[in-house]
Structures are given as C-alpha cells and as structure tokens.
C-alpha cells in the first residue's frame, strides 16, 4: 500500500491512499456495511450516487453468515457485493465481546458463542487474518482486546499488552503469507490514560501499513476523547495513515482531523437516517415531526445529493410515517452524502491551507440552533 501526504495544515493532513481496488483521498469517511452492504443501499448507490471509494465490512458477521469460505468461492467480497471500490474489514473482536454470551478472553484469543445459533468459536490473531484473506479485504484490522470505559488501570495495562502481542503475532504471520494487496493495520489501545497510550505505541512493532486509534467512543467524555487523540496521533508514524475507529459526529470528525487523523467510520449517518434524523449544515432535523408534513422543500437547499434533487421533506415525512422501506434508502443517501462531502470539503481546505477557518465556519453554522 502506498500512502502519500499531499499537504499538512497545522496538524490536519491531506493525502492519497493507493489500494489495489481504488485510490482513496484522505481525510476519508468510510460508510459501515456490517453485513457486506450499507443498510438499504446497493453497490450502484455507493459507487454512482455517493462516489464512495472505501467502505467497512465486519469480519465477525461475514464469518458467521454466509461464511468466509463461501465468499471466497464466490470470488471474494468485492465480487460478492459487486462493489468495485475497496473494503476495510475489522477483526470482529468487538462484536465477539458485545454480541455473544459467555465470552472468554484468553492469552491466545477469544472464545465466544455465535449470537445466531449459540455455536462455539475461537478467534486468534492468525484466525482473523485467515478470514480476512478469504474475504480479500483491502485493509485488515488486527485482533485486539477492547476495554470499555471507565476501566481500572490494571485492566488497561492487560489490554494494551495483549493487544500489542496479538498485533505483533499478526504482523509476522502476514509477512509469512506475502499478501501485498491485503494491507494490515495495528490498533493502539489504552483508554484515556495517556501513559497507557504511549506504552501501547511503544509495544507495537513498526512495519504495519497503517495505525488505528481504538478504544474510544466507548463511554468517555468528548474532552477525554480529544485529549487522547491529541496525545496519541503524534506518536504514530507520519508516513502511515491514521484511523480513528467508530467516531463519530461531524464535530468529532473535524476535531480529529485537526489533530492529525486521516480515516473515520461510524454507523451514525445511516442509523440516524433510519430513525428520522437527517443532517444539514444548520444542524440535525427530525423528519418525523409535524411541521414537515406540508414542507415542499428539500432536506437542504443547494444539497446535490440524489434525494434532495428529487424529493421534498413532506414526501420523506410521509414515507417515514408510513414505514415505507424506500424512506431508509433516501434518508441514508442524504446523510452519507453529507458526511462524504464534509470530509471532501475538509480535504480541500487543508490543501488550500485554510482548514481552521473552514472548521470554525462549519461549526458556527452547524451548532447555531443549539445556542
């Protein structure tokens, strides 16, 4: 994988990530396609209507259903989903912990039961790489030991040592397999304890294709999260992409970009869309509310998304109230367009050395309805 930094504005970075299936401009937001698709959207929506280059799929879910070997026999995840961009797959460790009963954390992996049928499974650092090789992921995440916050210092220390050990095992295994098109990212843990974050970076070997800041947006305050990012990002290699996992709001994303983060994913735009919350540059609106019943204007004037060019808030209000499946698609198209345009505009501002003023202007307008 080739990552080229094109511009730096203070700490904000703009770059190019060259993957075998696509060239990705950073900062980048990755829509979350847990089951190999973005809920209610298909590959044509992602490619032609949203111009998405990189999306996230979940190793745990793909492994349990339909099975990574099924996907491999059908030509890999790209052919299976007919998505001609790139896929990042997470390790599945978080889902093994959060969705399963009777999870057992061991020094060499995670024992868990399927949330589908109760069958017993064992994820190890090499097992999750084998699954992701079968999926033919462009970017693969190592197995890590994620800790919810707040957590005792002893548990954080256990987590970072175990995560670093698993990451280093993964790196050596990946080198042995010689799979240059499947790039491997490490994950830095440590909660909001800055010394633990530094230790995590120090214990994790160099040589990964990228580095993720994990273990955030799991119960800490926004200030704690930003302080942790500000401390951790400068410790990571400057010539490698930096990925903040599972974050977040438009404000969070712009703050993290200003701290040197390049990549983001979150279910927020699509989950909020399905639950009637739509993003605009003047803040969020709830399309289910009565005032939109006779509102013949688009979600946002001057928005160029597929939905806003064709449909009114009144129509979307009706679809939501009628529980029509089409609502989820149209709302998700708008919210993802909003997020993808946000990082695209942030990138342009970095290239033009005006990111801080762009961020200030965006946040002033976006939050004005909360004053």
Swiss-Prot record:
<dbReference type="InterPro" id="IPR002616">
    <property type="entry name" value="tRNA_ribo_trans-like"/>
</dbReference>
<keyword id="KW-0671">Queuosine biosynthesis</keyword>
<feature type="active site" description="Proton acceptor">
    <location>
        <position position="90"/>
    </location>
</feature>
<feature type="region of interest" description="RNA binding">
    <location>
        <begin position="246"/>
        <end position="252"/>
    </location>
</feature>
<feature type="binding site">
    <location>
        <position position="334"/>
    </location>
    <ligand>
        <name>Zn(2+)</name>
    </ligand>
</feature>
<keyword id="KW-0808">Transferase</keyword>
<dbReference type="GO" id="GO:0101030">
    <property type="term" value="P:tRNA-guanine transglycosylation"/>
</dbReference>
<keyword id="KW-0862">Zinc</keyword>
<feature type="binding site">
    <location>
        <position position="189"/>
    </location>
    <ligand>
        <name>substrate</name>
    </ligand>
</feature>
<comment type="subunit">
    <text>Homodimer. Within each dimer, one monomer is responsible for RNA recognition and catalysis, while the other monomer binds to the replacement base PreQ1.</text>
</comment>
<dbReference type="GO" id="GO:0046872">
    <property type="term" value="F:metal ion binding"/>
</dbReference>
<comment type="pathway">
    <text>tRNA modification; tRNA-queuosine biosynthesis.</text>
</comment>
<feature type="binding site">
    <location>
        <position position="303"/>
    </location>
    <ligand>
        <name>Zn(2+)</name>
    </ligand>
</feature>
<keyword id="KW-0819">tRNA processing</keyword>
<dbReference type="Pfam" id="PF01702">
    <property type="entry name" value="TGT"/>
</dbReference>
<feature type="binding site">
    <location>
        <position position="305"/>
    </location>
    <ligand>
        <name>Zn(2+)</name>
    </ligand>
</feature>
<keyword id="KW-0479">Metal-binding</keyword>
<dbReference type="InterPro" id="IPR004803">
    <property type="entry name" value="TGT"/>
</dbReference>
<feature type="binding site">
    <location>
        <position position="144"/>
    </location>
    <ligand>
        <name>substrate</name>
    </ligand>
</feature>
<protein>
    <recommendedName>
        <fullName>Queuine tRNA-ribosyltransferase</fullName>
        <ecNumber>2.4.2.29</ecNumber>
    </recommendedName>
</protein>
<keyword id="KW-0328">Glycosyltransferase</keyword>
<feature type="binding site">
    <location>
        <begin position="90"/>
        <end position="94"/>
    </location>
    <ligand>
        <name>substrate</name>
    </ligand>
</feature>
<comment type="similarity">
    <text>Belongs to the queuine tRNA-ribosyltransferase family.</text>
</comment>
<dbReference type="GO" id="GO:0008479">
    <property type="term" value="F:tRNA-guanosine(34) queuine transglycosylase activity"/>
</dbReference>
<feature type="binding site">
    <location>
        <position position="308"/>
    </location>
    <ligand>
        <name>Zn(2+)</name>
    </ligand>
</feature>
<comment type="function">
    <text>Catalyzes the base-exchange of a guanine (G) residue with the queuine precursor 7-aminomethyl-7-deazaguanine (PreQ1) at position 34 (anticodon wobble position) in tRNAs with GU(N) anticodons (tRNA-Asp, -Asn, -His and -Tyr). Catalysis occurs through a double-displacement mechanism. The nucleophile active site attacks the C1' of nucleotide 34 to detach the guanine base from the RNA, forming a covalent enzyme-RNA intermediate. The proton acceptor active site deprotonates the incoming PreQ1, allowing a nucleophilic attack on the C1' of the ribose to form the product.</text>
</comment>
<feature type="binding site">
    <location>
        <position position="215"/>
    </location>
    <ligand>
        <name>substrate</name>
    </ligand>
</feature>
<dbReference type="GO" id="GO:0008616">
    <property type="term" value="P:queuosine biosynthetic process"/>
</dbReference>
<dbReference type="GO" id="GO:0005829">
    <property type="term" value="C:cytosol"/>
</dbReference>
<feature type="active site" description="Nucleophile">
    <location>
        <position position="265"/>
    </location>
</feature>
<dbReference type="InterPro" id="IPR036511">
    <property type="entry name" value="TGT-like_sf"/>
</dbReference>
<feature type="region of interest" description="RNA binding; important for wobble base 34 recognition">
    <location>
        <begin position="270"/>
        <end position="274"/>
    </location>
</feature>
């Amino acid at each position: 994988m080739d990552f080229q930094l094109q511009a730096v504005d203070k700490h904000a970075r703009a770059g190019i990530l060259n993957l075998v299936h696509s060239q990705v401009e950073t900062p980048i937001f990755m829509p979350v396609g847990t089951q190999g698709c973005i809920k209610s959207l298909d590959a044509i929506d992602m490619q032609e209507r949203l111009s998405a280059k990189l999306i996230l799929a979940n190793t745990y879910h793909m492994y349990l259903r339909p099975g990574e070997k099924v996907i491999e026999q059908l030509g890999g995840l790209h052919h299976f989903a007919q998505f001609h961009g790139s896929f990042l797959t997470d390790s599945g460790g978080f889902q093994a912990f959060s969705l399963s009963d009777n999870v057992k954390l061991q020094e060499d992996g995670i024992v868990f039961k399927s949330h589908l049928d109760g069958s017993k499974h064992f994820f190890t650092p090499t097992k999750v790489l084998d699954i992701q090789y079968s999926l033919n992921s462009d970017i693969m995440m190592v197995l890590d030991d994620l800790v919810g916050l707040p957590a005792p210092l002893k548990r954080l220390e256990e987590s970072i040592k175990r995560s670093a050990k698993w990451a280093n095992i993964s790196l050596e295994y990946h080198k042995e397999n010689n799979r240059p098109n499947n790039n491997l990212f490490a994950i830095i843990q440590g909660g909001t304890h800055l010394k633990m974050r530094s230790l995590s970076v120090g214990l994790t070997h160099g040589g990964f294709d990228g580095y993720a800041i994990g273990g955030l947006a799991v119960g800490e305050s926004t200030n704690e999260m930003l302080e942790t990012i500000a401390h951790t990002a400068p410790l990571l290699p400057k010539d490698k992409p930096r990925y903040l996992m599972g974050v977040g709001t438009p404000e969070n994303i712009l703050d993290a970009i200003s701290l040197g983060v390049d990549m983001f994913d979150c279910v927020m735009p699509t989950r909020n869309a399905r639950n009637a919350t739509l993003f605009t540059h003047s803040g969020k609106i709830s399309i289910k509310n009565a005032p939109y019943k006779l509102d013949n204007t688009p979600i946002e004037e001057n928005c160029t998304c597929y939905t806003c060019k064709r449909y009114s808030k009144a129509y979307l209000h009706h679809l939501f109230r009628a529980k029509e499946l089409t609502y989820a698609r149209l709302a998700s198209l708008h919210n993802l367009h909003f997020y993808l345009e946000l990082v695209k505009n942030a990138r342009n501002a970095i290239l033009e050395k005006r990111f801080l003023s762009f961020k200030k202007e965006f946040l002033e307008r976006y939050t004005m309805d909360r004053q």
